[in-house]
Amino acid sequence: MQKQAELYRGKAKTVYSTENPDLLVLEFRNDTSAGDGARIEQFDRKGMVNNKFNYFIMSKLAEAGIPTQMERLLSDTECLVKKLDMVPVECVVRNRTAGSLVKRLGIEEGIELNPPLFDLFLKNDAMHDPMVNESYCETFGWVSKENLARMKELTYKANDVLKKLFDDAGLILVDFKLEFGLYKGEVVLGDEFSPDGSRLWDKETLEKMDKDRFRQSLGGLIEAYEAVARRLGVQLD
């Protein structure tokens, strides 16, 4: 399957059309951003690591019965995916306090959250992805009530699957975001799951193994991503 026209260039991925109108090529670049794209740097191997990491996670979620857009890997940095009509709202699950939640509520980082928190954010970099709720989604027509309920159900199911997967690898799944779209009327998981859009801590040391290493200038970003991938059994080379 050959990629054709560039359709969209995001902060770290590029989307291309193919000869099949129902399929797209997703290319993972080496770009890494923070502050809604205000700060961007390139890291060798990052596109490859995230592409293979994402394929591994999407495969695990599909095995658990969660519909995903993933079709197959095409190269070290590219995968073939279904073309979705993306919902402009992202779902976030929080198993521990971190990130914007800590700032918003003025609470300590690392508190276990039981049951996990579920948040919704409008995908809008210019507005810094404002937090919204189910009422906003219905009133502004971003997603139907039924489809939003399905997105929430699938997000919690993914959390159950991934918490165990990472726990078995000696990691804490602190929080993560998921994006969904519609494919022939069905809610399907799209975009990606990688250390770019999740928080992962070492279970023993609580060392951060995700993009917070870049956001907080801790260094060792790719080394951390590759360490997480190896623990999970992702084949990188």
Swiss-Prot record:
Keywords in alphabetical order: ATP-binding, Ligase, Nucleotide-binding, Purine biosynthesis
Membrane-crossing residue ranges in chain numbering: none
Homology family: Belongs to the SAICAR synthetase family.
Ligase recorded as keyword: yes
Protein name: Phosphoribosylaminoimidazole-succinocarboxamide synthase
Main EC class the enzyme belongs to: ligase
One of the protein's GO biological processes: 'de novo' IMP biosynthetic process
A single cellular component GO annotation: cytosol
Pathway note: Purine metabolism; IMP biosynthesis via de novo pathway; 5-amino-1-(5-phospho-D-ribosyl)imidazole-4-carboxamide from 5-amino-1-(5-phospho-D-ribosyl)imidazole-4-carboxylate: step 1/2
A Pfam family of this chain: SAICAR_synt
InterPro entries: SAICAR_synt/ADE2_N (IPR028923), SAICAR_synt_PurC (IPR033934), SAICAR_synth (IPR001636), SAICAR_synthetase (IPR050089), SAICAR_synthetase_CS (IPR018236)
MF (Gene Ontology): ATP binding; phosphoribosylaminoimidazolesuccinocarboxamide synthase activity
EC number, UniProt record: 6.3.2.6
Reactions the enzyme catalyzes: 5-amino-1-(5-phospho-D-ribosyl)imidazole-4-carboxylate + L-aspartate + ATP = (2S)-2-[5-amino-1-(5-phospho-beta-D-ribosyl)imidazole-4-carboxamido]succinate + ADP + phosphate + 2 H(+)
